[in-house]
Design a protein with these regions (language model features):
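Alpha-helical transmembrane segments in multi-pass integral membrane proteins
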Residues: 2-20, 34-70, 87-93, 97-98, ...
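Membrane-interface helix-loop-helix regions
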Residues: 50-69, 107-170, 176, 265-278
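Interfacial transmembrane-helix starts/ends
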Residues: 96, 100-108
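Hydrophobic alpha-helical segments with transmembrane-like composition
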Residues: 77, 84-90, 107, 147-206, ...
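Extracellular/periplasmic envelope-modification machinery, especially enzymes
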Residues: 359-392
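Hydrophobic alpha-helical transmembrane bundles that constitute the permease/transmembrane domains
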Residues: 23-26, 69, 172, 176, ...
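Hydrophobic alpha-helical membrane-insertion segments
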Residues: 24-38, 108-128, 297-305
Length: 392
C-alpha cells in the first residue's frame, strides 16, 4: 500500500492512490513464482535445468506466458517503484530525513528472517545431497553480504542464500541514488530523472553483467513518467494509446523470453502504462481492494524460494521424487503456499516488525534530542528478481 501525506504539493499528482499499480504488484509476484518453477526440474545435486524443462512444467501450455516471461516482473517492480517513490517523496519536504529509517523498517526484517530460514534449509539440503540447492556459494562471507543487503553489489561470487533477493540488493543502490538526487529532482524534475534513466539503460546495454544498471534505468524511468504526468495530467488519455501501441510493438518485435536488457522493455513499459490507464479510469476508487492485495507481493516474493526448498526436501523423500512436481497439484500447493505466506507475513510479521523498527528509531532520536518528523511515510516494497531460466 502506498501512503502519502495530505499536504498539497506542486510535485504530487491529484490522484492519492494508484490501486491498479498496487494490485499489479501481486500479479507480478505470481509471474516470478511461475518463472522459478523450473527449479523443481533440476535433478538432485545438479543445479541446472534440463533443456526440455518446459515440457516438465505442469500446464505449461496454459501458463506459457508466465513460465517463459515471468522474469520481466522484476523489471516491472523497478519501474513501479520509481513512480511510487516520486509520488510519495517528491512533494514531502521532510521525507529525506526519514527516508532510510522507513526503507529499512519496511525491507530488512523480512529479508533477515528469510535469509536465516534459507540458511537452515540449505544446511539440511547439503547434508542430504552434498551441495546447495540452486544458489551457491552459501558461506560466511556471502551471509555477511546478505546481512547488509550488499550481496549483489559486485562483491559476490554468485547468487547466494535466498537468491531472488538479488534485485532487492541492487534496488537499495537505486534508493541511494534517488535519496542523493532528491533535492535536484525537486528542482529540475524531468531532466534529471530522464538523464538517470537513459544513463542506466545505456550502461545496461554495454555492461550487461551488473544488475544495477537496468534497475536504475527502469526505476528512474518510472520517476520520469511521474514528472511527465505532472506536466500533462489532462493528457492522461494518451496512456491507453501508449499501452496499446507498446503492446502491439512488443508482440511484433520482442516475442522471445530473453533475460538481457533491453529485451522485454517494451512489455514492461506497456504494461506499466496499462496499469496507469486503469488507475486513471478508476476515479471512484473501486479498486481500493488492490492496496491490500499488493501488500502481499513482497512476502510472496521473498518466501517463494524457501517454500520451494521445503517442497523439494519433501519430494526427495517420496516415491517418484521431483518428478511429482510435473503434476499440477504440486504447482497449486507451491502457488498457494507462497501467496498465502505473503499475506500472512505482511499481517503478522512485516507490519509488526516495521512498527517496532520505527518505534526504536523514534526512541533513539528522542534520546539524542533530534527533532521528530511527522508520521513516517510507508511505501510498499517491490522486489522482485529473477534468476536465469537455466541457473548454474
Amino acid at each position: 500500500m502506498v501512503v502519502v501525506s495530505d499536504l498539497p504539493s506542486a510535485l504530487r499528482l491529484p490522484k492519492r492512490h494508484f490501486n491498479a499499480l498496487d494490485l499489479s504488484r501481486l500479479f507480478a509476484a505470481v509471474a516470478v513464482l511461475f518463472w522459478h518453477y523450473l527449479h523443481f526440474t533440476m535433478p538432485p545435486g545438479i543445479n541446472r535445468a534440463p533443456t526440455n524443462f518446459g515440457t516438465l512444467e505442469p500446464l505449461h501450455g496454459v501458463f506459457a506466458a508466465l513460465y517463459d516471461h515471468g522474469h520481466l516482473a522484476v523489471q516491472y517492480f523497478w519501474i513501479v517503484s520509481g513512480f511510487v517513490f516520486a509520488h510519495v517523496y517528491l512533494g514531502d519536504p521532510a521525507a529525506r530525513e526519514r527516508f532510510w529509517t522507513a526503507r529499512i523498517a519496511r525491507l530488512w526484517p523480512l529479508h533477515l528472517l528469510t535469509l536465516v530460514v534459507v540458511a537452515a534449509l540449505q544446511a539440511l539440503y547439503v547434508a542430504r545431497v552434498g551441495r546447495s540447492f540452486v544458489f551457491a556459494p552459501n558461506d560466511v562471507t556471502h551471509f555477511l553480504l546478505n546481512l547488509g543487503l550488499a550481496h549483489y553489489w559486485g562483491f559476490q561470487s554468485g547468487m547466494s542464500f535466498n537468491g531472488p533477493s538479488w534485485s532487492l540488493s541492487v534496488e537499495i543502490l537505486a534508493y541511494a541514488v534517488f535519496w542523493t538526487m532528491l533535492p535536484m529532482l525537486r528542482e529540475r524534475r524531468l531532466g534529471i530523472a530522464a538523464a538517470l534513466a537513459c544513463g542506466g539503460a545505456i550502461a545496461a546495454i554495454y555492461a550487461p553483467g551488473l544488475g544495477l544498471w537496468p534497475c536504475l534505468g527502469y526505476f528512474f524511468g518510472g520517476t520520469a513518467a511521474y514528472f511527465v504526468l505532472l506536466r500533462a495530467w489532462n493528457w492522461v488519455w494518451l496512456l491507453p494509446v501508449t499501452a496499446a501501441i507498446g503492446l502491439a510493438l512488443a508482440v511484433r518485435f520482442d516475442p522471445e523470453p530473453q533475460t538481457i536488457f533491453p529485451y522485454g522493455a517494451l512489455w514492461v513499459v506497456s504494461l506499466f502504462a496499462l496499469a496507469l490507464t486503469i488507475d486513471w479510469f478508476d476515479r471512484a476508487d473501486r479498486l481500493a481492494f488492490g492496496r491490500k492485495l499488493g501488500d502481499a507481493s513482497y512476502g510472496a516474493y521473498l518466501w517463494h524460494f524457501p517454500i520451494q526448498l521445503t517442497i523439494v526436501l519433501v519430494l526427495d523423500r517420496l516415491p517418484g521424487g521431483r518428478e511429482l512436481s510435473q503434476h499440477w497439484g504440486i504447482l497449486a500447493i507451491y502457488l498457494a503456499a507462497a501467496i498465502g505466506a505473503g499475506f500472512a507475513s505482511h499481517r503478522w510479521f512485516e507490519r509488526p516488525a516495521q512498527r517496532a523498527v520505527l518505534a526504536a528509531a523514534a526512541r533513539l532520536e528522542r534520546g539524542q534530542g533530534v527533532p521528530q518528523p511527522a508520521t513516517p511515510l510507508s511505501v510498499s516494497a517491490i522486489q522482485p528478481p529473477p534468476t536465469t531460466r537455466s541457473p548454474a
